[in-house]
Amino acid sequence: TPGQDFMRF
């Protein structure tokens, strides 16, 4: 989901 895209790092 786009909302969890920042959790990639």
UniProtKB/Swiss-Prot annotation:
Chief localisation class: secreted
Source taxon at top rank: Eukaryota
GO cellular component: extracellular region
Keyword Secreted included in the entry's annotation: yes
Reported function: FMRFamides and FMRFamide-like peptides are neuropeptides.
Tissues with expression: In larvae, expressed in the CNS and thoracic perisymapthetic organs (tPSO) but not in the ring gland or abdominal perisymapthetic organs (aPSO) (at protein level). In adults, expressed in brain and thoracic-abdominal ganglion but not in corpora cardiaca and corpora allata (at protein level).
Biological process annotations from GO: neuropeptide signaling pathway
Annotated keywords: Amidation, Neuropeptide, Secreted
Name the UniProt record assigns to this protein: FMRFamide-like neuropeptide TPGQDFMRF-amide
Phenylalanine amide: modified positions: 9
Places the protein is found: Secreted
Family statement drawn from the similarity comment of this UniProt entry: Belongs to the FARP (FMRFamide related peptide) family.
